[in-house]
């Protein structure tokens, strides 16, 4: 099964997550199909903390990819930010 999940990167005590499309059998930080965004929970003021390629996420969901619970929350958060910025 194809899933959309977070792959951890960054250094010790400085997490950084890539939002990736991957086969569920692969390791969390292992091989992936496509990178569709990132999440930086420790972004400094003025830095971008979240970016999602919504068109690619929609494409993969149409192909049957299942987002993890955390990814669902982040997509919803990013989408609401886009609506506020677009208004």
From Swiss-Prot:
Entry-linked InterPro entries: Ribosomal_bS16 (IPR000307), Ribosomal_bS16_CS (IPR020592), Ribosomal_bS16_dom_sf (IPR023803)
GO molecular function, one term: structural constituent of ribosome
One family name in Pfam for this protein: Ribosomal_S16
GO CC term, one of those recorded: small ribosomal subunit
Biological-process GO terms, alphabetical: translation
Gene3D superfamilies referenced in this protein's UniProt entry, alphabetically: 3.30.1320.10
Top-rank taxon: Bacteria
Signal peptide: none
Keywords, alphabetical: Ribonucleoprotein, Ribosomal protein
Ribosomal protein recorded as keyword: yes
Claim: rRNA processing is one of the keywords in the record: no
Family that this chain belongs to: Belongs to the bacterial ribosomal protein bS16 family.
PANTHER family linked to this entry: 30S RIBOSOMAL PROTEIN S16, SMALL RIBOSOMAL SUBUNIT PROTEIN BS16M
HAMAP family found in the cross-reference section: Ribosomal_bS16
The protein, known as: Small ribosomal subunit protein bS16
Organism: Nitrosospira multiformis (strain ATCC 25196 / NCIMB 11849 / C 71)
């Amino acid at each position: 099964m194809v899933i959309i999940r977070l792959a951890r990167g960054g250094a010790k005590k400085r997490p950084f997550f890539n939002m990736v499309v991957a086969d569920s059998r692969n390791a969390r930080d292992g091989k992936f199909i496509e990178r569709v965004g990132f999440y930086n929970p420790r972004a400094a003021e003025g830095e971008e903390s979240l970016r999602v390629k919504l068109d690619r996420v929609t494409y993969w969901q149409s192909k049957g990819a299942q987002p993890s619970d955390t990814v669902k929350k982040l997509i919803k958060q990013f989408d609401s930010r886009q609506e506020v910025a677009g208004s």
